[in-house]
């Protein structure tokens, strides 16, 4: 299996789920991709510049991008850093999954988060290529084997859910709830709207999430 380029955020109570707020359920939240300002600037000089170990600006800190972003959000929740625009997405998701019953910090301490696409894009309107998605598949399986989630919650249908790999996948209804079979265990996966979508409603999404996940 291929190691992920962007290491996942793993909440402390995901690691020790016995008394977590989801009744012991280990939830993997699957996002889409990262935006990289460094890549944006590189593209001004070299249109072929691409995210990864071969990027001329690669540093080992690139691998902790996902974890660093989540930690920055948690620091904001603690009053330790200033607000940034992306934090609205993380807050809206936390409110959707908890129905406003828990703080965003509590939610993020109880879940794992991983962006499926393992190659950042240079700005928010740019989309990963089909090659980028394909090359992210093996790392996704590696994450499932290592984190052993009980359920996967996808942020978005077209960009995330529909680009996850078909190997080991079964979808009885052909649309929403299906499952991966990894090491003999079935891992259900479903999707909600991406919380960055302007029309995202935590109340509406909570109704869908509550069919599969309950806050205790």
Residue ranges and their predicted role:
Residues 1-82, 136-143, 176-179, 212-216:
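Active-site and ligand/interface coordination hotspots across diverse enzymes
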Residues 3, 127-141, 160-216:
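C-terminal capping/extension of enzyme domains
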Residues 20-24, 105-106, 146, 182-184:
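Extracellular/periplasmic catalytic domains that process cell-envelope and extracellular macromolecules
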Residues 28, 112-114, 151-153, 188-190:
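Hydrophobic/aromatic beta-strand patches that form the interior of the parallel beta-sheet core
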Residues 70-86, 117-132:
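Surface-exposed cleft-lining segments at the edges of enzyme active sites
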Residues 102-117:
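Short, contiguous, well-structured surface segments enriched in hydrophobic/aromatic residues
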Residues 140-157:
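Proline-aspartate-enriched helix->loop->beta-strand connector
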């Amino acid at each position: 299996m291929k190691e992920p380029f962007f290491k996942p955020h793993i909440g402390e109570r995901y690691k020790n789920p016995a008394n977590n707020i989801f009744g012991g359920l280990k939830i993997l939240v699957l996002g889409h991709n990262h935006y990289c300002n460094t890549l944006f600037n590189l593209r001004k000089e070299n249109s072929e510049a691409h995210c990864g170990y071969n990027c001329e600006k690669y540093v080992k800190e690139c691998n902790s991008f996902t974890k660093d972003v989540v930690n920055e959000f948690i620091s904001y929740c603690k009053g330790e850093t200033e607000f940034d625009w992306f934090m609205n997405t993380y807050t809206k998701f936390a409110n959707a999954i908890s129905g406003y019953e828990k703080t965003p910090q509590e939610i993020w301490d109880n879940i794992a988060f991983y962006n499926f696409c393992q190659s950042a894009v240079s700005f928010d309107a740019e989309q990963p290529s089909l090659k980028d998605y394909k090359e992210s598949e093996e790392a996704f399986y590696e994450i499932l084997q290592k984190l052993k989630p009980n359920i996967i919650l996808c942020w978005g249908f077209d960009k995330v859910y529909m680009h996850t790999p078909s190997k080991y996948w079964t979808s009885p209804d052909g649309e929403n709830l299906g499952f991966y079979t990894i090491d003999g265990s079935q891992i259900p996966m479903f999707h909600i709207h991406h919380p960055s979508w302007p029309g995202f409603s935590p109340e509406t999404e909570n109704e869908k999430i509550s069919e599969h996940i309950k806050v205790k």
